[in-house]
């Protein structure tokens, strides 16, 4: 009788991005989901680590990589190609944030950026963006952490990985306020400012789109149901194409003026509709509570 033990092929996620964008916060979120997490691994060691993980029958591996030099970027490409040849398709998650956000976070931590070397902080940020532009273009998932909290980042990571990044197309529906800018990581953006604003209804003004009163008001407006019907059909029709192109997650942003009433209510309804179609969905209200 054979005593050979069957090993699992692990799912591999690579977490990288701009310094100060939240790589370690993302790693902690994944670790809380039961992933085996390794921080600051040189790219050249990725293959050996996967072998060790597989030998110990660990099926989910998340690796935080710091790729700021051409040599390390090339080494990552070699490592990823080697895994592809073995039937392991690692997912790359790239985190970024605005210059202002990174400066604020770095000043709060009182730690210089790795590329700063005594120079100006913004120059170091710009250099890092240029060095990582190719990697960002190849990422399976790009998350802009500028306007989201650590908790919201964890929720997005949870949505991407809790059910497995390779198990069909997932939709992230995000409400936002145009006055705070359009989410730069959105794949599709819809504007619901054509609907009457509950802000001008005194009894609804202090409430949010999560309130049944506000949601009922928004959905009762002319064009609201038709809008959601059409967006639902559009996304349902696009889903097979996204999957054929290898896209694992689509971020749909729905905006109103402040992100408190209309976009929140519409995002909740759209997320419910997509879930009823069998898609993995999550809803994030980026600007709720910031008014």
Swiss-Prot record:
GO molecular function, a single term: ATP binding
Record's keyword terms, sorted: ATP-binding, GTP-binding, Nucleotide-binding
InterPro entries from the UniProt entry: P-loop_NTPase, RapZ-like, RapZ-like_N, RapZ_C
Positions that bind GTP: 66-69
Positions contributing to ATP binding: 17-24
Protein family membership: Belongs to the RapZ-like family.
Entry function: Displays ATPase and GTPase activities.
Protein name in UniProt: Nucleotide-binding protein PPA0813
